[in-house]
């Protein structure tokens, strides 16, 4: 705090910026969004398996 802006009556907890937290969507909403694709659509896993296959 700088200069004349200091106020000893203000508690540190009152200075914390409050963030709005969005609630977690329901399971049905997540499935509808395709948030959890099939394991066959996992490009990272496919790349690792392809790399491992080439090394054999």
Swiss-Prot record:
InterPro entries per UniProt: DUF2737 (IPR020295)
Protein's name according to its UniProt entry: Uncharacterized 6.6 kDa protein in eae-abc2 intergenic region
Lineage, uppermost ranks: Viruses, Duplodnaviria, Heunggongvirae, Uroviricota, Caudoviricetes
